[in-house]
Design a protein with these regions (language model features):
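Short amphipathic alpha-helical segments
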Residues: 11-34, 67-73
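Short amphipathic alpha-helices within nucleic acid-binding modules
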Residues: 17, 54-63
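Hydrophobic pocket/interface hotspot
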Residues: 7, 19, 23, 35, ...
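Short alpha-helical
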Residues: 14, 42, 55
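Glycine-rich beta-strand-turn "strand-cap" elements at beta-sheet edges
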Residues: 1-4, 8-10, 33-46, 70-99
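Sensory beta-strand/linker motifs that couple input domains to effectors
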Residues: 50
Length: 99
C-alpha cells in the first residue's frame, strides 16, 4: 500500500540554498518512489515523500535521520516542543487521479 510522509521545516536566514542543495544531493533511499520540496512561505518548506509502503518508510528512518543531520544546522526550531521538524506519515486512504 502506498504511503506518504510530510515534513515541515523553517530555514535560518541565509540558509535556503544549503537546505535545498542537501535535498538535491541526497542519496537514493530504497522504497522512496518520489519526493518534492515545496516552498510554503518565507524560509518555510515542506517535503512530501511517496513510499512503496509504511514498512519501507520505517526501514528508511536511519537514512532520513542521517540526511537531516547533514542539514540540521540550516534549520530553526519550530517552537512548541517540535524541534526543527514537524513530521507526519501514513497510508493512502483515497487516491484521486485527474490526469
Amino acid at each position: 500500500m502506498t504511503s506518504y510522509n510530510v515534513v515541515r521545516f523553517k530555514v535560518k536566514s541565509g540558509q535556503d540554498q544549503a537546505f535545498l542543495d542537501a535535498h538535491r544531493n541526497a542519496p537514493k533511499i530504497e522504497g522512496l518512489c518520489d519526493a518534492s520540496v515545496i516552498k510554503t512561505g518565507d524560509r518555510t518548506y515542506c517535503i512530501i515523500g511517496k513510499w512503496d509502503s509504511m514498512d519501507k518508510l520505517a526501514a528508511a528512518r536511519p537514512q532520513m535521520i542521517a540526511l537531516l543531520d547533514s542539514f540540521r544546522h540550516t534549520l530553526e526550531d519550530l517552537g512548541g516542543g517540535l524541534g526543527v521538524t514537524d513530521p507526519v506519515s501514513g497510508d493512502v486512504v483515497v487516491s484521486l487521479n485527474h490526469a
